[in-house]
Amino acid sequence: MDIYKFAVRPLLFDLVKADPEWLHQQTMRSLSWLSHTSDRTSTKWVQNILQKSLCIEDSRLEQNLFGLRFPNPVGLAAGFDKDGVAARIWSSLGFGFAELGTVTFVAQPGNPPPRLFRLPLDQAALNRMGFNNHGAAVMATRLADEKGLFSIPIGINLGKSKVTPLEAAAEDYLNSFRLLKELGDYFVVNVSSPNTPGLRSLQDASMLSSILDVLQKENQSHKPIFVKIAPDLEWEAIADIIGLAKTYQLAGIIATNTTIRRDGLKTQVIEQTGKAPQEEAGGISGAPVRDRSTEIIRFIWQQTQGEIPIIGVGGIFTPEDAWAKITAGASLIQVYTGWIYQGPMMVSQILTGLLAKLEEHELNSISEAIGLEFKS
């Protein structure tokens, strides 16, 4: 029996009605403690228990992409470990990679609370966090102390500081990249969060090109750089970004961030505010984004004949959800909201399910499943 799903989650969500952000903060405190006391005998014992319970090791799940070895294709999406305080623990929870951030050059508190809401009827979350983080310099100091101690690839998601005007966005991203470029295995240009005023306008080809240009000129170490896009973009805008990915030799595209659309939601009223989701600002993640993000993955694969790697994220709860994104063209996938709802067993359940899918389709490795929809 999945204790989290049938006992812990109902207790926290329904009986205690714990505030989602408070619950996240307590979780991060615990994970941070485990991460930073990993040399203690007691902590090693806990990590061994976690690894035996949550980690799946199988060579069929391994991939080598953009110079990095991924032990499995399931990663932690940005937004959970904003400041990299638990970077060393994610491998013990079964993840094949983890993306830290979003981090900005200037430390910022984010938007005023309440700013994180569960929509259980929709298996979704609504957030308007606003890139709350301690800043790139603090993250750099923390990661420098732990350099070489990570057993999985660690990505860093970069955002624009709220105080920085849009016309100075390129320099803002560059300043963060300069501090962190030797400390992350890959980097993500986040221009798709709906919670920083004007940020999504940076997805425009002319604005985005100025950011990518300065980053790649600084990128002497040839670190893989991705751009993360919104699910609300029109096909023409996505095609423009694909063109930029080719021009600036990006490692790939992450599809997708949260949506600002509210159609089709079952939730009528958000309990914390007494308002309908349509009246609340922020982006929605989870199941409502699932189909659209997969459509965009499919579009990118078709437009590029699979030449640009895709990290698929949005509404992944089950092995079937993961398989759909991989066969549509995603080389890797990321989870966040699904992990909150399904609990820590979810990663191992997805990986076990993916192995079953490989056997069902008589495939030797997960890489053979990428874009399987389009292979005869």
From Swiss-Prot:
Q: Which organism is it from?
A: Trichormus variabilis (strain ATCC 29413 / PCC 7937)
Similarity field: Belongs to the dihydroorotate dehydrogenase family. Type 2 subfamily.
This protein's GO cellular component annotations are: cytoplasm; plasma membrane
Q: Which residues bind substrate?
A: K82, N127, R128, M129, G130, F131, N190, N195, N257, T258
Question: Which protein are we looking at?
Answer: Dihydroorotate dehydrogenase (quinone)
HAMAP family assigned: DHO_dh_type2
- Please name the GO terms of the biological process aspect recorded for this protein, alphabetically: 'de novo' pyrimidine nucleobase biosynthetic process; 'de novo' UMP biosynthetic process
Alphabetized, the UniProt keywords read: Cell membrane, Flavoprotein, FMN, Membrane, Oxidoreductase, Pyrimidine biosynthesis
Q: What is its EC number?
A: 1.3.5.2
**How would you summarize the oligomeric state and partners of this protein?**
Monomer.
Q: Which reaction does it catalyse?
A: (S)-dihydroorotate + a quinone = orotate + a quinol
For this chain's record, the cofactor binding note is: Binds 1 FMN per subunit.
Required cofactor names? FMN
Instruction: State its location(s).
Output: Cell membrane
Q: Enumerate the active-site residues.
A: S193
How this chain sits in the membrane, per its record, is: Peripheral membrane protein
- Annotated pathway: Pyrimidine metabolism; UMP biosynthesis via de novo pathway; orotate from (S)-dihydroorotate (quinone route): step 1/1
Residue positions binding FMN = A78, G79, F80, D81, K82, T102, N157, N190, K228, T256, G286, G315, Y336, T337
Quote the function comment for this protein.
Catalyzes the conversion of dihydroorotate to orotate with quinone as electron acceptor.
